[in-house]
Amino acid sequence: MEKISNLLEDKPVVIFSKTSCCMSHSIKSLISGYGANSTVYELDEMSNGPEIERALVELGCKPTVPAVFIGQELVGGANQLMSLQVRNQLASLLRRAGAIWI
C-alpha cells in the first residue's frame, strides 16, 4: 500500500491505467470531461508497473485497471465510476476532492 500511497500524495484524482485498456480510456475521458486534471499512471509503461498492479490487487481492485482514487480514497474501477456518473454523484466527489471548482 505504501507504494500506492506515495503515488497518491497531494493529487486530487489518480487513475491507474494501461494504454491498451479501452475501459481505462473511457474513464480518463469521463473525468477529463469535467475539467479535472487527473494524474494517470500507465502501468504498462512503468518499470514497476507489475509491482503496483499486485498492490492494487491487494486493495481489492479486480480487474486492476482502471483503478481510480479521488481524494486519496479508492473509488473503484469502471463500474463504480459509471455508477457514480449515472447517479449524478461523480461531480460532487470531484468537487470535494478539489479536482474541479464548479
Swiss-Prot record:
Full protein name: Monothiol glutaredoxin-S1
Name the GO terms of the biological process aspect: response to nitrate
Q: Which UniProt keywords apply?
A: 2Fe-2S, Cytoplasm, Iron, Iron-sulfur, Metal-binding, Redox-active center
Q: Where in the cell is it found?
A: Cytoplasm
InterPro entries cross-referenced by the UniProt entry: GlrX-like_pln_2, Glutaredoxin, Glutaredoxin_subgr, Thioredoxin-like_sf
* Role noted for this protein: May only reduce GSH-thiol disulfides, but not protein disulfides.
Native organism is Arabidopsis thaliana
A GO term from the CC aspect? cytoplasm
**Gene Ontology molecular function terms on file:** 2 iron, 2 sulfur cluster binding; metal ion binding
Q: Which residues form the Glutaredoxin domain?
A: 1-101
- Give the matching CDD domains: GRX_GRXh_1_2_like (cd03419)
Q: What is its main location?
A: cytoplasm
Looking up Pfam families in the UniProt record yields: Glutaredoxin
Which of this chain's residues are annotated to bind [2Fe-2S] cluster? C21
Question: Which NCBIfam families does the annotation name?
Answer: GlrX-like_plant
Family the UniProt entry places it in:
Belongs to the glutaredoxin family. CC-type subfamily.
